């Protein structure tokens, strides 16, 4: 009889330990996810300011803006769900980015295309994103 009681007690303790471990794991995950969301809010705000300073400032030269187009595209792709865009604006931006990527992928003698109309393709995108971010 004492063997059954000991076995029962050990089983209860194992179940309790498992429940405690799962609770701790859920608590840690909750904290990580919560702080991750807070970090992404801060990161979104910082990236928005950075994009606005580059593309929303008329004193920044065209070369600097063209050089930062990949950052603008990455910003849009990462945070597009946070930007308040109409369906038409979103469709236009997606099409412009598709054109931009197609032009970036074109090779001339094994080298990516340089300059050209890259900025012109995304000029409207820049205007819409800056309007939404600011």
UniProtKB/Swiss-Prot annotation:
It holds the Pfam family Turandot. InterPro entries: Turandot (IPR010825). GO terms for cellular component: extracellular space. GO terms for biological process: cellular response to heat; innate immune response; response to bacterium; response to heat. Residues 1-38 form the signal peptide. A humoral factor that may play a role in stress tolerance. This is Protein Turandot E. It comes from Drosophila yakuba (Fruit fly).
């Amino acid at each position: 009889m004492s063997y059954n009681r000991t076995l029962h007690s050990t089983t209860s303790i194992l179940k309790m330990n498992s429940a405690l471990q799962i609770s701790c794991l859920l608590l840690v995950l909750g904290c990580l996810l919560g702080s991750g969301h807070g970090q992404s809010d801060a990161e979104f705000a910082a990236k928005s300011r950075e994009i606005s300073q580059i593309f929303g400032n008329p004193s920044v030269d065209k070369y600097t803006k063209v050089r930062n187009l990949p950052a603008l595209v990455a910003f849009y792709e990462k945070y597009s769900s946070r930007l308040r865009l109409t369906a038409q604006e979103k469709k236009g931006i997606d099409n412009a980015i598709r054109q931009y990527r197609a032009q970036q992928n074109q090779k001339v003698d094994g080298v990516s295309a340089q300059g050209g109309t890259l900025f012109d393709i995304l000029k409207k995108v820049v205007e819409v994103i800056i309007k939404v971010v600011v």
